[in-house]
């Protein structure tokens, strides 16, 4: 059985997005740039992008019929392999679009899932990704079979028949049950591990994907965590014991968030995200050099609220000041954000050239010390 993923050989693709909900032109272009980066990370090359302003995506074909024909003409004349859409498509939308375009159709969710599958290194991460992929595939079985038949030269829309689809549905449901059982066992082990960490305050690095969390983790903990200038370079949770001025605490590097993160991933990565839920302090890292960093800030906050309703103490870290090149001055930006954050600690750093890293460590020290004193007011460890 086949399903739409990016192949190892670089594929030529088109990007398609519906602009709605009051999104301005500048933001729409930045969204497309992100989609192109996702495609590149997965191994594809974006040749051209189509956008259409609509109040909401067309329930049948995502874009209007006229725009779909434009896409078809371009794809036919430019030898395009795949069409990538900037939203999760319903099974019927994928079926209708494939029928019109006769191309591999990839929506945003399967694109991100494919990247996660490439990035997964450990048994834990691979199990979480497989569960998310299976949950995505289950309602789309009919479409996947017709896609396979067309690849093999099948006539029209003939599929393998209802009985074969039902058999595959049962197989996938059984596999989903197995993955959930495996994750349940891993959850138990991780819960025990967290319980064994004792009284140490837990600090979690959070942020949009590719903002420099792993580089910062390496600097603070003086250990080597995989860091790369690619989306979702970190999937596995890394926990390190850090000591600053004789004050020990645990520092966790977590998977990066992204706009329109597939709901299947939030569900299957529960045990990984538990590190965020159970943290005492969050360090929210932002890429100050990114033109859309304010939107990233809101995306991460929204995702954090989805996975944990409790508001935690947070340090806001503005990273990559070495690459900051906006018209507004850095001092003016600092004043604006310090006022906006209403007293929450924030600091401007560069993890690459190590600017203000010592200051960040001092902010961390004071916040961890404050949390420890509240939790253990009669403990003489800090006095």
Describe each region flagged by the PLM.
Residues 19-23, 54-56, 88-91, 110-113, ...:
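Conserved nucleotide-binding/hydrolysis micro-motifs of P-loop NTPases
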Residues 110-129:
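Short alpha-helix plus adjacent loop in nuclease-associated cores
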Residues 195-198, 219-249, 263-271, 293, ...:
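Switch I (effector-binding) loop of TRAFAC-class P-loop GTPase G-domains
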């Amino acid at each position: 059985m086949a399903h739409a993923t990016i192949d190892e050989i670089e594929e030529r693709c088109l990007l398609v997005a519906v602009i709605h909900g009051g999104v301005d032109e500048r933001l729409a272009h930045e969204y497309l740039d992100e989609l192109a980066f996702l495609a590149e990370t997965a191994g594809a090359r974006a040749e051209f992008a189509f956008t259409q302003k609509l109040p909401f995506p067309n329930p049948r074909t995502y874009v209007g019929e006229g725009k779909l024909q434009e896409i078809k003409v371009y794809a036919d004349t430019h030898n395009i392999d795949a069409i990538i859409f900037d939203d999760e498509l319903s099974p019927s939308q994928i079926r209708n679009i494939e029928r019109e375009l006769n191309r591999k159709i990839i929506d945003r969710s399967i694109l991100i899932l494919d990247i996660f599958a490439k990035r997964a290194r450990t048994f834990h991460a691979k199990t979480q990704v497989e569960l998310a992929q299976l949950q995505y595939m289950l309602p789309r079985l009919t479409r996947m079979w017709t896609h396979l038949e067309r690849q093999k030269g099948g006539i029209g829309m003939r599929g393998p028949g209802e009985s074969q689809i039902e058999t595959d549905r049962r197989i996938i449901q059984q596999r989903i049950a197995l993955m959930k059982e495996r994750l349940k066992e891993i959850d138990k082990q991780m819960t025990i591990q967290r319980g064994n960490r004792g009284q140490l305050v837990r600090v979690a690095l959070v942020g949009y994907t590719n903002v420099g969390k792993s580089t910062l983790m390496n600097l603070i903990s003086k250990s080597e965590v995989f860091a790369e200038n690619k989306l979702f370079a970190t999937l596995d949770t890394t926990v390190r014991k850090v000591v600053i001025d004789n004050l020990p605490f645990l520092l966790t590097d977590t998977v990066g968030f992204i706009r329109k993160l597939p709901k299947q991933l939030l569900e299957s990565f529960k045990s990984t995200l538990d590190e965020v839920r159970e943290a005492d302090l969050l360090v929210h890292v932002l890429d100050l050099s990114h033109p859309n960093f304010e939107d990233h800030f809101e995306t991460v906050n929204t995702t954090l609220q989805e996975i944990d309703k409790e508001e935690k103490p947070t340090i806001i870290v503005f990273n990559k000041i070495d690459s900051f090149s906006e018209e507004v001055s850095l001092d003016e930006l600092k004043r604006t954000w310090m006022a906006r954050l209403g007293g929450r600690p924030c600091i401007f750093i560069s993890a690459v050239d190590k600017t203000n890293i010592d200051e960040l460590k001092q902010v961390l020290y004071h916040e961890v010390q404050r949390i420890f004193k509240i939790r253990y007011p009669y403990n003489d460890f800090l006095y």
